[in-house]
Structures are given as structure tokens and as C-alpha cells.
Amino acid sequence: VTAPLTDEDVPAFWGALGLPGLIDAHVHFMPPRLMESVWAYFDEPGPLIGRHWPIVYREPEDARVERLRAFGVRAFTALLYPHRPGMAAGLNAWALEFAARVPEAVPTGTLFPEPGVAAYVERAIEDGVRAFKVHLQVGGFDPRAPELDAAWGVLAEAAVPVVVHAGSGPVAHGFTGPEPFGAVLTRHPGLTAVVAHLGAPEYDGFFALAETYSRVHLDTTMAFTRFFEEMGAFPPALLPRLRDLGESGRVLLGTDFPNIPYPYAHQLQALAGLGFGDAWLREVCWHAPARVLGVG
């Protein structure tokens, strides 16, 4: 298949693969004020960013939804996350309202280690939330926190996938790396997890978790893009394992739209450029995320 050179080429890319579109497991939508504050954070190369990060798709919410539709993204998560206690339940309510307005959006919740977390996670699932986002870096918390144990159990029991930013990229902070989240999986081996950014930069350790636990997946967010490779190249020795994981349905397309400093098409270019073939791309860009997110 020919890699898309521009965003206008994206539909031809998935069309040539014989797919009905794309499913993106790592897209951000959040209340406008929170999105503005996230963008402001990216404007200042702060401690968790570490470099210049000019966001390409800094547009009103409606325009961002229309852009995804134009790309042919048939379903996408709407990832959001709290940075302090007392935020998560309100974010979950907003996410359900957003998904009710935008049929392509998979209703996405979040959590924070605080009293009552298991109860509001359970309630969110009852209300229709179909995926969760946990950002260990921004949240700055330990996934092994005792308050979270019951919540992880609820998620595992309900087979609701959790997209987890658990790697130490772009800047190591708090309880990142494979060990803390690996300890959660030891306690809850049935948890359906999607490790964001292929677990960068601790690829090896997170690949090992995916190879050990049958419900652990990885998303491709920013991986192999020029921007990401400048921060630390993917180890070539791991490419065969990435190919195998993708072929076995454990790698999901993720992009970080809209918070990316390059066109959407560049992520697809980067994946096509791996040379793993069309069947691998079909699995990553549609079949695996469709299964994990229960869409398509």
C-alpha cells in the first residue's frame, strides 16, 4: 500500500488496504477549558514535555470532529484525564455527553486514586463508558495505590479496556515504567490494557508484559514519527517482536490527535514505512482496535 503523503491522502490509504476506514484508539477530547489548559501546557516546554511541541490541530471541537470524519476515522476514543482528586467523576459525565453528541466517539472515562473511585468507575460503566484512560505521568500517582485496587478489579471484571500512559516518555516522572503497572497486572491478570506509545521509551519491558498477559495491548501513538524518533529511536532489535505482536492483534492504531506537532497522515506513513505488509496494517488500523473497543 502507498503511504499517505498528506491528510487528503488518508482515505486512499485505508481504501487501498480494503478497510472501511480507520479506528483510532488514542484521540483526545475533553471539556474546552481543560483542552485549552492542556494546549497551554504544550506551549511552554515544561517539565513533562521537555521540548517545543507546536500543535497542528488546535481548532474548535466541532472542527476536530469533522476532521476525523474527513480522514475516515469511523470510531475513536475521547481520552481525558484528571491531574488532581475530585475531577474524574465530572470528566466521566462530560465524556458520556460528548459521546451522545458524536456517534463515532467511544464513551471514555478516567479515574484517580481517591475515596470512592471504584464506585464511580462502576457507575460510569453502568452509564455506558466503554474505555478508560489513566495517565500515570500527568496524574503523578502510583498505579499500585491501595485506593485503586478495587477499581482495577471492576475494570478487569467488566472487560473494559484501559488506555494507560505508563511509559516514561517524553520525560520520566512519578510511577512510570513497566514495574509499577506490571505489579497491577500481577494482581489483576485479566485486565484489558492498552499501553500508550508502545510503552516508550521502555519498549522492551512493556512488550514483555504484552507477551505475558493475553489482554495487554500496545498503541502506536507517535511511534516511528520523525518527532518521536528525535527523542529516542525505537530499538531495531525489537522490530520482530513488534511485528509478531501486531500480527496477533495486540497493537492498535493510536495517534494523539489533536495534540500532535505534525499532520495526521505522518503517523500512518511511519507505520507503513515499517515494511510489515498490508495484513499487519489492516490488523493495526482496524481489526485489533475494533475488537478491543467493541466497535466496527
What are these regions (language model features)?
Residues R33-V38, A89, Y120-V121, F175-T176, ...:
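Short aromatic-enriched loop/helix-cap "lid" or pocket-rim segments at secondary-structure transitions
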Residues N92, G116-A118, F181, E202-F206, ...:
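Short, well-ordered alpha-helical microsegments
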Residues V1-A25, L34-E66, A70-F71, A75, ...:
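Mid-to-C-terminal alpha-helical segments outside catalytic/metal-binding sites
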Residues F29-M30, S168, A200, N259:
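Short active-site segment of divalent metal-dependent hydrolases/proteases
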Residues P4, R74-T176, T225:
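Active-site gating/metal-coordination segments in enzymes
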Residues H26, A95, A124, F132, ...:
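Conserved, mostly hydrophobic/aromatic
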Residues H26-P32, H165, H197:
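Histidine-centered divalent metal-coordination motifs
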Residues A3-T6, R130-A131, F141-L252:
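Catalytic pocket-lining loop regions of alpha/beta-barrel enzymes
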